[in-house]
Amino acid sequence: QGLYTAIIAGFFISFFGGSRVQIGGPTAAFVVIIYGIVEQYGTDGLIVATILAGIILVIMGICRFGSLIKYIPYTITTGFTCGIAVTLFVGQLKDFFGLEIASVPSEFLNKVIAYVQNISTINLTSTIIGVVAIIIMLFWPKVTDKIPGSLIAIIITTAIVYFAKLPVNTIGSVYGELNSAFPTFHAPALSMKLVQEMISPAFTIAILAGIESLLSAVVSDGMIGDTHKSNAELIGQGLGNIFSGLFGGIPATGANA
């Protein structure tokens, strides 16, 4: 579902959004919200909430709510960016160290506790491969900046694992064979009761998506010396989430690559 969201929502957010360099797709900030909605209302509930959130975001953009971004203190922007970085960093530790955990908690502190409790399952081979990848990414720019170091790291470490037949998890071993078919239109099973129940989660998704995308756009502005269009960004986010939901995707927002 995340891949479908990156394709569908990513296209609409990039095409209609107001930032030249910001990408769109599912982000770590939505994990807790998505988990709660699916647990209580199922996949159809999440799809309805995503579509409603998209409609709310479009309305916010039309009403020019994006202009309010200028009143947000810069310290919030900095803290927000650091928070995302820490969340993503901690989220990758399980796979980096090859820890064997049946179910990883979605909450930050519980996730850290689970890592500590299962530290004895560390896979040294997986850790070494991860370290090699980091070293390549750090030092490759000294060789050339025409090819991204991350791409070179993926190619080299994948080749090492494949030819040496190292005992580490791969995308195939963890997720199985990926569906190569393009996502199809999916109309959720609607009922007035479900729509009413999804209004509150939809507002939560819309507000979080709006704030995250606009703050990320501000960060992107600082990187390239440009100014984004806040209201257009909200409309793009809204359209991205509407179509993401219609094709069975999950909530999406703008983010820094």
What are the residue ranges of the model-derived segments?
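Transmembrane helical cores of multi-pass ion-transport proteins
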Residues: 1-257
